[in-house]
Amino acid sequence: LDEGPRQRAVASEGATMPIHGSLFQAHAENQSTDPFVQQNKKLLKISMAYGPVWARTGSMVAYQGDIRFENRGSGGLNKLVKSKLTGEGVSMMYCTGQGELFVADSASEIQVFYLENDSISVNGANVLAFSASIEWDIHRVNAGRASMMAGGLYNVSLRGTGYVAVTTKGDPVALDVGSAPTYADADAVVLWTSGVTMDVRVDTGGMKSLIRGGTGELIQMAFGGQGYVLVQPAESVVEGGHQATEKKSGGLGGLLGG
């Protein structure tokens, strides 16, 4: 005899109910064992088997294993003083241990590349994570009159050998500054490579300049030399003298088209 729906429901209690759909398969963990792996465009997986890493404070979204986090703020007294004096800096945490660390920043796109005895200059708002083998510091990108008028512009320099992950608002473009004179809105520039020279231009024409056909951008960066500048399709917001993002695997050549 049919027990009826109530009896069948009681009998099925404790049984494992299957979940239908491809949710867990489509979003399964990337099994690559590389040090820095893009789980997807907006989530980075870091294997701690390769040693300690620096990650942006607050960027951890998950981890598996035994990982310890030490918030070192701006990275030591020297960097702290520079951060306070310039208004530019990035708060980082030192990550050690074993396992896999997943980091992200407000669902921004993530770009990964490898530095080999090289250096780059990065907008502090775009720094996400990098190998502990890489040295970093806060530096002034231009000391000219235009930069002084702009209130000073400061970046984070990364130098050495190891992996680097930066964030961008949307898919960026890598411009070869050696092919033609290159200019960009200072608030849209993510980074530039060694060998690139930069000068700051300030549009003092205001509304008249805009009416005459100007860009309407107060601060522009003019690039020369040899190398690449990475530009995102969105501007950062200048807050208190420093740049901050809006509300918030391959080598370097692979990222920049080299």
Regions from the language model: what does each represent?
Residues 1-16:
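N-terminal amphipathic/basic-hydrophobic helices that include classical n-h-c signal peptides
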Residues 14-258:
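Composition-driven recognition of glycine/serine/threonine/acidic- and proline-rich low-complexity segments
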